[in-house]
Amino acid sequence: MKRFLLCSFALVLLYPAGIDMYLVGLPRIAADLNASEAQLHIAFSVYLAGMATAMLFAGKIADQSGRKPVAIVGALVFMMASLLCSRASEGSLFLSGRFLQGVGAGGCYVVAFAILRDTLDEHRRAKVLSLLNGITCIVPVLAPVVGHLIMLRFPWQSLFYTMSAMGIIVGLLSLFILRETRPARRAPRDLSRSSPAAESLVNRFFVSRLAITTLSVSVILTFVNASPVLLMEVMGFSRGDYAITMALTAGVSMVVSFSTPFALGLFKPRTLMLVSQGLFLTAGMTLSLAHTNTVTLFGLTLICAGFSVGFGVAMSQALGPFSLRAGVASSTLGIAQVCGSSLWIWLAAILGISAMNMLIGILIGCSIVSILLIFSVAPNRSVAEHEEIPYQSRS
């Protein structure tokens, strides 16, 4: 079992590393490529577009051909794309590399969640996804620090050499450590209970959890996107104060994420999901009424705690009904989360909504809709919580 957890964690970490590692070198990259920082900031959207593109195909391929081939190819694409970015001499080539980086990271991301669905029952899966969320929160804090240390002695290209090395390591883990987890075809007596046709992506329970996770990701990405404006322009923080504040909020996320597995031993998943949305609602109301920086910071802290306590549980529930189509389900969740959050941020910008109101709006909207869905759509107990995986006995 340890091999599956190790490989899943490594596969997921390519996604945040690809976002955060290069940011510290952005001014120097812009200067060398004769582009403005504003022009290169689109690299974030291009990276997410690459992820969404990969997710369109990676899930179905993983269900048909296996998790392992997709993981190996995804890591290889990420590695080669990182080298392409390091060799870029102008902006368009750099953005092409960023898109391909997203493709590689997106394929690995989908496979990681499919592997966890294949190998863990619902209770353990919720705990592991919460831990995974906590580990993911470490990357936005450590990656810029590592990037800064690298650039003290080496040029910005070294950042992408480092990411390329990460791709190589993940590829080697996928090749030599990861074992295939795609479930074997079921006996005829089992087909009525679990078949690709029966595991529909349009059933009410999956759609409800897809909506909850998409709204939750929209909350956290809106927070990340709006945080520079809120903290440095509205609240008057310096760059150093901003970095410290974001590190502290990431610390809150880590503590809550690592505590959630223990909470799952005491409370039902539904209770933790309601607590998560209650924290979002409280955060939205706090920010709307805040008149001091202290109160505003308290509201921002509630956002991080709310996301960490509920997201892993909701993702586990969303993947629960799928054994033969875990890859497709994981892809669908990823696409909805990336596209849904990007759409909200884009619409808010087009409509001229301020950073604070953008954040308050998604917090209150997410919490109300999610609470209604949690109460109105319960898990389907006719679906087995865990499917036996023939490969598990070999771990």
Curated annotation (Swiss-Prot):
Localization in the cell: Cell inner membrane
Molecular function in Gene Ontology: transmembrane transporter activity
Pfam family, one: MFS_1
PROSITE patterns: MFS
Domain of life: Bacteria
Protein name in the entry: Multidrug resistance protein MdtL
Chief subcellular location: membrane
Family per similarity comment: Belongs to the major facilitator superfamily. DHA1 family. MdtL (TC 2.A.1.2.22) subfamily.
Topology term for the membrane: Multi-pass membrane protein
Source organism phylogeny: Bacteria, Pseudomonadati, Pseudomonadota, Gammaproteobacteria, Enterobacterales
InterPro entries: MFS (IPR011701), MFS_dom (IPR020846), MFS_trans_sf (IPR036259), Multidrug-R_MdtL (IPR023697)
Membrane spanning stretches: 4-24, 42-62, 69-89, 93-113, 131-151, 158-178, 217-237, 247-267, 271-291, 295-315, 333-353, 358-378
GO cellular component, one term: plasma membrane
Alphabetic keyword roster: Cell inner membrane, Cell membrane, Membrane, Transmembrane, Transmembrane helix, Transport
The keyword Transmembrane is annotated on this UniProt entry: yes
Keyword Transport in record: yes
